[in-house]
Amino acid sequence: MEVQLGLGRVYPRPPSKTYRGAFQNLFQSVREAIQNPGPRHPEAASIAPPGACLQQRQETSPRRRRRQQHPEDGSPQAHIRGTTGYLALEEEQQPSQQQSASEGHPESGCLPEPGAATAPGKGLPQQPPAPPDQDDSAAPSTLSLLGPTFPGLSSCSADIKDILSEAGTMQLLQQQQQQQQQQQQQQQQQQQQQQEVISEGSSSVRAREATGAPSSSKDSYLGGNSTISDSAKELCKAVSVSMGLGVEALEHLSPGEQLRGDCMYASLLGGPPAVRPTPCAPLAECKGLSLDEGPGKGTEETAEYSSFKGGYAKGLEGESLGCSGSSEAGSSGTLEIPSSLSLYKSGAVDEAAAYQNRDYYNFPLALSGPPHPPPPTHPHARIKLENPSDYGSAWAAAAAQCRYGDLASLHGGSVAGPSTGSPPATASSSWHTLFTAEEGQLYGPGGGGGSSSPSDAGPVAPYGYTRPPQGLASQEGDFSASEVWYPGGVVNRVPYPSPSCVKSEMGPWMENYSGPYGDMRLDSTRDHVLPIDYYFPPQKTCLICGDEASGCHYGALTCGSCKVFFKRAAEGKQKYLCASRNDCTIDKFRRKNCPSCRLRKCYEAGMTLGARKLKKLGNLKLQEEGENSSAGSPTEDPSQKMTVSHIEGYECQPIFLNVLEAIEPGVVCAGHDNNQPDSFAALLSSLNELGERQLVHVVKWAKALPGFRNLHVDDQMAVIQYSWMGLMVFAMGWRSFTNVNSRMLYFAPDLVFNEYRMHKSRMYSQCVRMRHLSQEFGWLQITPQEFLCMKALLLFSIIPVDGLKNQKFFDELRMNYIKELDRIIACKRKNPTSCSRRFYQLTKLLDSVQPIARELHQFTFDLLIKSHMVSVDFPEMMAEIISVQVPKILSGKVKPIYFHTQ
């Protein structure tokens, strides 16, 4: 039967449905009824719904008045709650309209006064059983606990009258209605004076008092020979539920009604609540306890909280609720409560025994339903229950865990009061904190700054806590030593290392970085500007496919596979064509897909058939170490034994030229804003920016030249730092010849110098000489092949006066490039005299570059000194090279190599 709890009315039962909910509304608040015992006004019968006749009667017995004024336990709570332990059933929709009736009217529907219960406060003595001469109406037998039904049928529905007529229990119900109306009227009076909620204490006392007075109505109503129909039993269930003692509860509210805030099970109606283990079959449907703190609760409510809910159930420190009864009694909604069983104990003697049978970490919680209301900040509460519905299905099992911690620290509260179950402050400090306040989640000690409710903090991630070694463990005795536990499937978040744990030096994987820029830091122990790692970082991977390199093969550091491929492709006469756009990806797994792009990449890396092969990468390292150790010894350097075999000549073989064409740098822009007016500072700043960008391309180009990597690393860097200016001037002259026919200086597509800019830059004389160099390309009809070979030879045309570390190898490499230039000339001309004349012209052109480069060195050095005065910007790398290496050239320590006597 479907019944609205605590509202004193009965509703028809839906067909084929039985709602089983929590054991709800056992007792409700009665403080207002005692504090405001104003006159009662009869409620209009016309507006009363069916079952509204369940009201309470004011007590008139002199003995009960004396008991109310002088309670036997002497506690102040006894005076507040009135003469009985029953709590009023509040009429929520019409709290001010209360029906008054006398005991003589059977239609009043009042109930007799049950026996007095124990005090609701924690730690109060138990109420002794009622004396034998006490009124039978005060003996709370099972029948009186359930409460009778309605004998006055004027306000009852026709269906109920038919049911009662068929069952033959009309007279019995009329007798029991009077007792029920008396009971409800007394509870209505107590409702206005007390708002404390007693969980199970009053029921225990009534069970003890049941032994003092027999109940004849119980025997007659529930006897073995009873012929009451199922419909009558359903009606009994409804009345029992209205009294708060039934095992079946209504789960749906009628429209316009709200759930009471002070109901024990108010927060459990949203979904299937937690089930408390109990051996009693009739209580199998009983759910966990929960109390929500109402706004009007007094500060004296310091009862201990139970562990059944994320909310807080008070007064449960004694034994678990026990009951006995057959399945018949369970089906009829009655409860057999032994008189010897106490439902509430005030002492703390049996606290440990009460908690031994509880499983604090494996409550069967609901996986759906609305979120729980925010728990109050209470110094005695130590339960933090996470709702599994806040997580996904993967977290459901892990989330259904009860987490313990000091509630005051958990919710950031500062409430401190007397508490028997509150742990020391150090208990919360042992929590395993994985979340911080910035993440918007409460986890671990909340120390302020965190949110005080789950709604503010959001769903708490299901990470484990550290169980407090003190606090509840000292009371219940079932906690082991503190240990960090994590639910299944939860991986701990990796924390960021502290600064003391951060490794400052680079690891081995960083040392092998083969990027084009390498390490930009300077080495103060050397006299050069940039470290060798900037230009030539240590290479341990194949330059072609990225696989592990086995050595330097054919002038480049490659693996064995690329070594064999290059040998077969370079020596063979087969021509490879790319099926795509000559931009195929060549790596360890796709190096065999396109032989054409792989061969092109080999040429770009500097591989040539005539280059000297090093046996292994380790041998090169040992040779370099030997050079450093024997730099001052008269013994011959091991690296000097290396000889560079001459590049085998062949008639117009394009392999060498193909390499030079493949590695030629692309177009580089200066980033100059041509919309701004030309000025000295703007033009020179753009030139310096262009010089730094081109220097990066020069480094890449030089490293790809055949045989260049066989030089000593210090020699490689020195050659680039001394010859970069001549290389840029020579390349700019070629661009000016090919793009603007040498009429202007084509530094970059966005930076072209005409006569006006030449004057504006204050380097007109240098610009005139560079333009004259560009015109020489036209006068001599320089071919692209000749330009590429001359540019490569220009790289090896300036050295220090004291020589390089491996001067002999440098001289041999330079001679090979000179011979290549001679072969290129000979490919076009059959007459030896013509070849000699052409060779003379080209070498004279190379010699003319060196004076121009020297003038530019002097100009840039002077400009760097007074750059702060003229507001000219110098990039960092350009400024360092000019300040360190250019003075060596200007002072004569570094001199160019001329083909002809100057």
UniProtKB/Swiss-Prot annotation:
Comp. bias (Polar residues): 196-205, 213-224
Keywords: Cytoplasm, Disease variant, DNA-binding, Isopeptide bond, Lipid-binding, Lipoprotein, Metal-binding, Nucleus, Palmitate, Phosphoprotein, Receptor, Steroid-binding, Transcription, Transcription regulation, Ubl conjugation, Zinc, Zinc-finger
Region named Interaction with ZNF318: 1-569
Coiled coil: none
Zinc finger (NR C4-type) boundaries: 542-562, 578-602
InterPro entries xrefs: Andrgn_rcpt, NHR-like_dom_sf, Nucl_hrmn_rcpt_lig-bd, Nuclear_hormone_rcpt_NR3, Znf_hrmn_rcpt, Znf_NHR/GATA
Region named Interaction with CCAR1: 574-901
Keyword RNA-binding part of the UniProt annotation: no
Residues carrying the site annotation Interaction with coactivator LXXL and FXXFY motifs: 703
Residue ranges occupied by any NR LBD domain in the UniProt entry: 651-882
Signal sequence region: none
Numbered residues of crosslink Glycyl lysine isopeptide (Lys-Gly) (interchain with G-Cter in ubiquitin): 828, 830
Sequence segments annotated as region (Modulating): 1-540
Tissues/organs with expression: Highest levels in the seminal vesicle, ventral prostate and coagulating gland with lower levels in the kidney and levator ani muscle.
Family to which this protein belongs: Belongs to the nuclear hormone receptor family. NR3 subfamily.
Note: In the absence of ligand, steroid hormone receptors are thought to be weakly associated with nuclear components; hormone binding greatly increases receptor affinity. The hormone-receptor complex appears to recognize discrete DNA sequences upstream of transcriptional start sites.
Full protein name: Androgen receptor
Organism, as annotated: Rattus norvegicus (Rat)
Record lineage: Eukaryota, Metazoa, Chordata, Craniata, Vertebrata
